[in-house]
Design a protein with these regions (language model features):
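Hydrophobic regular secondary-structure detector
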Residues: 1-108, 112, 116, 267-627, ...
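Surface-exposed amphipathic alpha-helical segments in non-transmembrane regions
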Residues: 16, 23-32, 63-80, 93-179, ...
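Alpha-helical scaffold elements that line and support the substrate/ligand-binding pocket
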Residues: 180-182, 190, 400
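Solvent-exposed, charged amphipathic helical/linker segments at domain boundaries
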Residues: 182, 706-713
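PDZ/PDZ-like domain micro-motif
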Residues: 189-191, 265, 570-571, 575, ...
Length: 826
């Protein structure tokens, strides 16, 4: 090592070029780094989605999910298989080990799924793709008192405009419904004309078409033959001929049905500050530049607002660039203050030149670290910059130890290049081994094979690179800069004060510290016992919960999310009642704060976004900046929870006021093949959780039970020329509907559904009047050929590694959640 140090110390030009190269690489790396508030959640997982319209959860589980699981169980590199079966939908998530090539894994899974035999005929083609978790970057709200269709079409146009902006590519819409053309057949009209449901559906399929029929090759050129009769409006569908009699009379769709060119039936109410609204969510991209993306969006907003229709406005609702800039400003100020303090402390006992070059060496080490981070997939975010602060002390120690050693040798041996070489060489072994042990301490984070391991991996990369660059700077560059040190003579001014401070420190070390050191060395067993005892006491204090620990401490957001999941089949009116309950809590909170502090109510909440559908209610409360309010986000969230109270029929209630939290505070997963045993275990665990004072919103993932009407063919029905498959098909057509085609429109395909009127489909009594048609055209009351029985069914089935699974969740404060976990595991 001494030879390497000597060469660089004797070649200062090379040392300076090395320093310049490190700094240049650092600057270029800093410029090219991705910038985001928090690192992306990278996971090697494949998701398989299957849509089976109208199917019950048990059917989806048995005929779709289990067959896909069976095909994937023996696939190499599969770490975990999770699945969910709900009404009309099945999803299988296949997680791979961290060392697996994800692209090859996706292809392997896709090949296995494509080879599965026996899947139901009427399912949509399984969609296989890599799971991607993308954080929200910016959220823009489009709101105004206009019709739903006008607001949706405008939002779709604006989405395309935003997606074309630089540093933006993924934009999702929330608060909209899919467009749908519905042909609502009248049972009375079909009976009067003698037309069946299937006849109408087939007429639309065969008449509403665009079809290429080849071409005529003439002497003057080819002429294409095309049938262009695709219906695309209400009038087009109403004019489709269903039947034409021998006398020339025609029966058209308009004679039998009401055509509605609107939206799918799932009602949804989306508002912002009381106005109809649509949210445009800008998601994180692969090359994240959150600040530049924010600037581009703000410029676009300023240009677009004047062009909007009257009464419609765009509001920047959420911007992670503000969080990023705030955190970076705090960390940057801490770094600058730290370097200044290091310089001031060093200059108390070391020469200004030594203090300056040592401080500069620390800065060079940190700047140089940026040169290697982009190549290691590390972005500039709160986590990576915190790693810089974490390693700051060790980097400072390296530079100070080497610089002080060179300074000491210059004082004792006359200075010059040889003193610089000797000083650096004298401490090379302890410094290098200290750095290596630190690298080893953080090395396990490289190999964490867990979800989210990419986040902790950034700590190890930053620390390892920073320490490596600091060693290069301390032993290859710093000696060349301090080779001109000479022994100080004729001390005066600052030099005299530095000598006095140095003598004071040495006097303390030679007297008080030396005495303590000798005393402890002579009583080594007592000394060891004291430190072992202190260690045991420290562990005990931590284990008892007196000292709280959180690997990822909560970072409060400027928004509070309230998410209420209701059972499938919940009436839309009930969702509106829950939404009203949340809004009343908000108004009561504003009133409370306003009565306690004059004018404070206007400063607490900036806006309120709400979305209600049949099975979920979401509210987002936007708070004013922290410096403009007296209550923290946590206090506001806790008070809102108290004011809202419990919602007994809700399957899940979540109130989140942090940026970096995902999911409930407490989660337990129970696995077994017997659903009855899972229900019993879940109930027992929920009762236990409810006994803790700090736990609330205790739920499981079963989402209660739903009523089902089971149909069974009566004896003798087959003699009438009818079977259960025919009855089921006709009932499905009547109550679920039949998709006859999809219309290509500007913003995506639009389903064309043939079904019975909504009023009929929302009444149980309609089953008593429903008639099924036999193959020879006869109509029979449905209940004359089938028996109906009401049974209980599940709303959702979760599976993990071929077993059924139930998740039990609860909300609690971070500290209370840890205590509850600890007590339950005893």
């Amino acid at each position: 090592m001494e030879g390497i140090i000597a060469w660089w110390a004797r070649n200062p030009v090379a040392a300076n070029l090395l320093m310049a190269g490190i700094m240049l690489g650092g600057v270029l790396g800093f410029i090219s780094m991705e910038r985001e508030a928090f690192p992306g959640f990278n996971i090697k997982q494949v998701q398989i989605e299957v849509i089976w319209p109208g199917a019950a959860p048990q059917e989806v589980e048995e005929q779709v999910v289990m067959r896909i699981e069976e095909a994937l169980t023996d696939l190499d590199s599969v770490r975990r298989i999770s699945a969910t079966a709900s009404e009309g939908y099945g999803r299988v998530d296949v997680a791979a080990y961290s060392y697996v090539d994800i692209n090859a894994f996706v292809n392997d899974v896709k090949n296995r799924v494509d080879a599965v035999n026996g899947l139901p005929r009427d399912i949509e083609k399984p969609q296989v793709k890599r799971t991607e978790y993308r954080d929200e970057m910016i959220r823009v709200a489009l709101h105004g008192n206009v019709s739903e269709k006008a607001l949706t079409r405008l939002a779709q146009d604006l989405r395309d405009q935003i997606a074309a902006l630089p540093y933006v590519s993924i934009v999702n819409l929330y608060g909209t419904r899919r467009e749908e053309v519905t042909v609502e057949l009248s049972e009375a009209s079909m009976r009067s004309f003698g037309v069946s449901f299937a006849e109408v559906a087939q007429a639309i399929r065969s008449s509403s078409i665009n079809l290429s029929s080849g071409q005529v090759r003439t002497a003057t050129g080819d002429i294409r033959l095309r049938a262009r009769n695709l219906a695309d409006s209400q009038a087009d569908f109403e004019n489709i001929i269903v039947r034409q009699t021998a006398g020339g009379a025609t029966v058209r769709v308009g004679d039998l049905a009401t055509v509605v060119d609107g939206f799918e039936e799932n009602k949804i109410l989306t508002t912002m500050n009381g106005q109809p609204a649509v949210l445009l969510d800008l998601l994180a991209t692969d090359n994240m530049q959150v600040v530049k993306a924010s600037e581009a969006v703000k410029t676009w907003l300023a240009q677009t607002r004047p062009t909007l229709p009257q009464g419609v406005n765009l509001t920047l609702w959420f911007d992670t660039a503000e969080i990023y800039k705030s955190r970076m400003s705090t960390i940057g100020d801490s770094a600058y203050m730290g370097l200044l303090l290091v310089f001031l402390v060093l200059i108390l006992s070391l020469r200004p030149k030594v203090a300056l070059w040592v401080t500069a060496g620390i800065a060079v080490a940190f700047i140089g670290t940026f040169s290697l981070l982009p190549a290691n997939d590390v972005s500039l975010n709160v986590m990576s910059t915190f790693a810089f602060l974490l390693v700051l002390g060790i980097v400072v120690d390296d530079a100070i130890v080497v610089g002080e050693s060179i300074h000491l040798h210059a004082q004792r041996h006359g200075g010059g290049t040889e003193a610089a070489i000797a000083g650096a060489s004298a401490v090379s072994k302890p410094v290098i081994f200290a750095v290596i042990t630190t690298m080893i301490a953080f090395a396990p984070w490289f190999f964490l094979d867990v979800e989210g391991g990419h986040m902790t991996e950034q700590f190890s990369i930053v620390i390892t690179v920073a320490l490596t660059i600091s060693l290069i700077e301390a032993f290859l560059i710093l000696p060349a800069h301090l080779r001109h040190l000479k022994p100080r003579e004729n001390l005066r001014g600052l030099s005299l004060w530095q000598r006095r401070i140095e003598h004071s420190i040495m006097h303390f070390a030679d007297t008080y510290y030396r005495r303590i050191l000798h005393w402890t060395a002579r009583r080594r067993y007592l000394t060891s016992s004291i430190f072992i005892g202190a260690f045991i006491v420290s562990v005990g204090i931590f284990s008892a919960g007196w000292v709280k620990f959180s690997f990822f401490p909560e970072i409060q957001n400027q928004q509070i999310y309230i998410n209420v999941m209701l059972p499938n089949g919940t009436p839309y009116s009930r969702s509106l009642e829950v939404l009203d309950q949340l809004q009343r809590a908000e108004l009561q909170l504003i009133e409370e704060v306003g009565s306690g502090s004059t004018g404070e109510s206007e400063k607490l909440i900036q806006g309120w976004y709400a979305r209600a559908s049949r099975d979920s209610v979401i509210a987002i409360v936007r708070l004013t900046p922290q410096e403009q309010r007296t209550m923290s986000a946590r206090e506001v969230a806790q008070r809102l929870q108290d004011l809202v109270g419990d919602i007994p029929d809700a399957d899940e209630i979540e109130v989140n006021y942090t940026i970096n939290r995902r999911g409930p505070a407490i989660t337990y997963m129970l696995r077994h093949r017997d659903m009855g045993m899972l229900r019993a275990a879940s109930g027992e665990l929920q009762s236990k959780l409810r006994s803790y004072e700090g736990a609330y919103y205790v739920r499981d993932s079963l989402r209660g039970e739903s009523d089902e009407i089971h149909l069974k063919l009566l004896p003798g029905a087959t003699r009438l020329g009818i079977n259960l498959a025919q009855v089921s098909q006709q009932v499905r057509q009547a109550y679920y509907g039949e998709e006859v085609q999809r219309l290509p429109r500007e913003n995506g395909d639009v389903k064309v559904m043939v079904k019975y009127p909504r009023a009929l489909r929302e009444s149980n009594s309609s089953l008593n009047d429903y008639r099924v048609r036999t193959a020879d055209g006869r109509e029979l009351p449905m209940l004359s050929v089938v028996a109906s029985e009401v049974n209980n069914g599940v709303q959702r089935i979760q599976r993990r590694d071929v077993d059924r699974m139930v998740s039990v969740t609860a909300e609690a404060d971070v500290d209370q959640a840890r205590d509850i976990y600890t007590e339950l595991e005893r």
